[in-house]
């Protein structure tokens, strides 16, 4: 196994099909349960457009919109290696160059935009 590590930040939007339908922002899950995957993707697509015109706003947008508790750190997940994240998330992150922002990535947790930071 490679000891290569990456560092990334992300914005997670959960939806009806997410593995866990609650988050630090929506503890009882009422908003998440009412959100379709298409709604979640639409929300991320508009955030992604904002990010493409202003990449520096990533941590601010993550803090305001992400359903992951990493939002409290501007979406920062810290460094991780292969096998530590869900496969689609890992593959997308390792494929990015530092500073690049991913397309929409689907996992059991919901839909994500990922920014590789290291």
Curated annotation (Swiss-Prot):
Keywords: Cytoplasm, Isomerase, Nucleus, Rotamase
KW Cytoplasm (keyword) present: yes
SUPFAM superfamilies: FKBP-like
Protein's cellular compartments: Cytoplasm; Nucleus
Gene: PARV12.8
Stored InterPro entries: PPIase_dom_sf, PPIase_Pin1, PPIase_PpiC, PPIase_PpiC_CS
Cystine connections: none
Domain PpiC: 3-118
The keyword Nucleus appears for this protein: yes
Record organism: Digitalis lanata
Protein name per the record: Peptidyl-prolyl cis-trans isomerase Pin1
Family: Belongs to the PpiC/parvulin rotamase family.
Posttranslational modification: The N-terminus is blocked.
Broad enzyme group: isomerase
Superkingdom of this protein's organism: Eukaryota
One Pfam family hit: Rotamase
Extra remark beyond the main annotation: Like all plant Pin1-type PPIases, do not contain the N-terminal WW domain found in other eukaryotic parvulins, but contains a four-amino acid insertion next to the phospho-specific recognition site of the active site. These extra amino acids may be important for mediating the substrate interaction of plant enzymes. Three amino acid residues (P79S, E91D and A95G) differ when compared with the partial sequence of purified protein. The existence of two or more genes coding for this protein is not exluded.
GO cellular component term, pick one: nucleus
UniProt xrefs under PROSITE patterns: PPIC_PPIASE_1, PPIC_PPIASE_2
GO molecular function: peptidyl-prolyl cis-trans isomerase activity
Organism placement in taxonomy: Eukaryota, Viridiplantae, Streptophyta, Embryophyta, Tracheophyta
Enzyme Commission identifier(s): 5.2.1.8
């Amino acid at each position: 196994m490679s000891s290569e590590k990456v560092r990334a930040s992300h914005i997670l939007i959960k939806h009806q099909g997410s593995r866990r339908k609650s988050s630090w922002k929506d503890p009882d899950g009422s908003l998440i349960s009412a959100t379709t995957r298409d709604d979640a993707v639409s929300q991320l697509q508009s955030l992604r457009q904002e990010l493409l015109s202003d990449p520096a706003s990533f941590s601010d947008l993550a803090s305001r919109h992400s359903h992951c508790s990493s939002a409290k750190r501007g979406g920062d997940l810290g460094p991780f290696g292969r096998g530590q994240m869900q496969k689609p998330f890992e593959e997308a992150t390792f494929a990015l160059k530092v500073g690049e922002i991913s397309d929409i990535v689907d996992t059991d947790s919901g839909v994500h935009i990922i920014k590789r930071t290291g």
